[in-house]
Regions:
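Short, hinge-like loop/turn segments at secondary-structure boundaries
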Residues: 1, 78, 107-109
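Helix-loop-strand module that forms the ligand-binding subsite of alpha/beta enzymes
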Residues: 3-93
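Glycine-rich phosphate/pyrophosphate-binding loop and the adjoining helix
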Residues: 87-151
Length: 151
């Protein structure tokens, strides 16, 4: 109710930083085709407890795995952005990098390139939105309509 999580921990430390930021990058290793459970708990609490407008803050997610599960985890993380009116920064491939042991991801040339392109695109998108906000303002928000499927 007050824009803070009832559990007074790192989530309440992140919230004011997120409010001031133009974008948010979230990264996770892949466990059973899913993001790290602690990260998901933080994101659930952060996005649920904060009441500031997240519209047009740019989101980006990055995953790291030995082999599979990256695209499912990528989708899981991006859902926080898309339900919050946040555009998602693109790259030339899904934002993942591969490695099994510590330090191995440095050998994933395609993954590193994908993340470099992501960084450039995210920077460009945040700058473009800032210029658009100055010149045109943000899109007009509609009053939320909620549909209940059980009547």
């Amino acid at each position: 109710k007050n824009g803070k999580c009832v559990f007074d921990d790192v989530v309440n430390e992140l919230a004011p930083k997120f409010e001031e930021a133009d974008g948010l990058v979230v990264a996770s290793p892949v466990y059973y085709a899913s993001a790290n459970a602690t990260l998901i708990a933080v994101l659930d609490r952060l996005f649920y407890s904060t009441h500031f407008d997240k519209t047009m803050k740019v989101g980006a997610s990055v995953t790291c795995a030995r082999r599979g599960g990256c695209s499912a985890t990528f989708d899981e993380l991006n859902k926080y952005f898309t339900i919050s009116n946040m555009p998602v920064a693109p790259s030339q491939y899904w934002n993942s990098i591969h490695g099994r042991e510590k330090g191995e991801a440095v050998w994933d040339e395609e993954g590193k390139q994908t993340l470099r392109v992501l960084a450039g695109n995210m920077s460009f998108l945040m700058k473009s939105i800032a210029l658009g906000r100055e010149q045109f303002g943000l899109p007009e928000k509609e009053e939320r309509v909620f549909t209940h499927f059980i009547r």
